[in-house]
């Protein structure tokens, strides 16, 4: 099974192409949709991970990519016929253990978070950071880890600022 890595721009594209997510995120954060591009990485991760609706839509996009890659997605002609018959449109979903599920397309089955990364970081790890920030669980170890990650993310920009000031 492949590892699916989402870049910030891919996540923003998912948000921007889904008007419901876009409205939800923009309304919650009092932002215009284009402001999402200006957010700090940690802020964007926290917004997305704390929005069940955004997460389920991202999971659905990942699932559709997985299904397309495996070649098991129904083609559009069949979809139209199934819809006319009143049958529920179904797709095959294969989990990490190779077990095949036949699930309705409208649902979003569980996507194994262990295969999904966000900026080369496991989704579970990013989720822990967002939850600790949200719950104000500021113990010393969590603060050190967060500061180290933020420092590593901003190191290139600090270096370029020093060069400009010389």
From Swiss-Prot:
Pfam families: Phage_Gp17. Keywords: DNA replication, Early protein, Viral DNA replication. It comes from the Viruses. Transmembrane segments: none annotated. Induction: Expressed in the early phase of the viral replicative cycle. The C2 promoter controls protein p17 transcription and is strongly inhibited by the viral histone-like protein p6, probably because of the formation of a p6-DNA nucleoprotein complex at the right end of the viral genome. Thus, protein p17 is synthesized very early after infection, and its synthesis declines later on due to the inhibition of the C2 promoter by protein p6. InterPro entries: Phage_Gp17. One of its GO terms (biological process) is DNA replication. Belongs to the phi29likevirus protein p56 family. Homodimer. Interacts with the histone-like protein p6; this interaction optimizes the binding of protein p6 at the viral DNA ends, thus favoring the initiation of replication. Involved in the replication of viral DNA. It is required at the very beginning of the virus amplification, conditions in which a low number of viral DNA molecules enter the host cell, possibly to recruit the limiting amount of initiation factors at the replication origins. Once the infection process is established and the other replication proteins reach optimal concentration, it becomes dispensable. Optimizes the binding of protein p6 at the viral DNA ends, thus favoring the initiation of replication. This is DNA replication protein 17.
């Amino acid at each position: 099974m492949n590892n699916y890595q989402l870049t910030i721009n891919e996540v923003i594209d998912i948000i921007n192409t889904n008007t419901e997510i876009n409205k939800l995120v923009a309304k919650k954060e009092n932002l215009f949709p284009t402001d999402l591009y200006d957010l700090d990485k940690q802020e964007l991760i926290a917004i997305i991970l704390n929005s069940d609706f955004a997460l389920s839509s991202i999971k659905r996009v990942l699932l559709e990519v997985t299904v397309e890659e495996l070649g098991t997605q129904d083609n559009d002609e069949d979809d139209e016929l199934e819809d006319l018959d009143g049958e529920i449109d179904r797709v095959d979903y294969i989990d990490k253990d190779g077990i095949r599920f036949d699930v309705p397309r409208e649902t979003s089955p569980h996507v194994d978070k262990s295969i999904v990364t966000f900026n080369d970081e496991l989704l579970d790890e990013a989720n822990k950071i967002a939850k600790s920030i949200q719950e104000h669980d500021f113990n010393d170890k969590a603060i050190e880890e967060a500061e180290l990650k933020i420092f590593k993310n901003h190191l290139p920009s600090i270096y370029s600022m020093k060069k400009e000031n010389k």
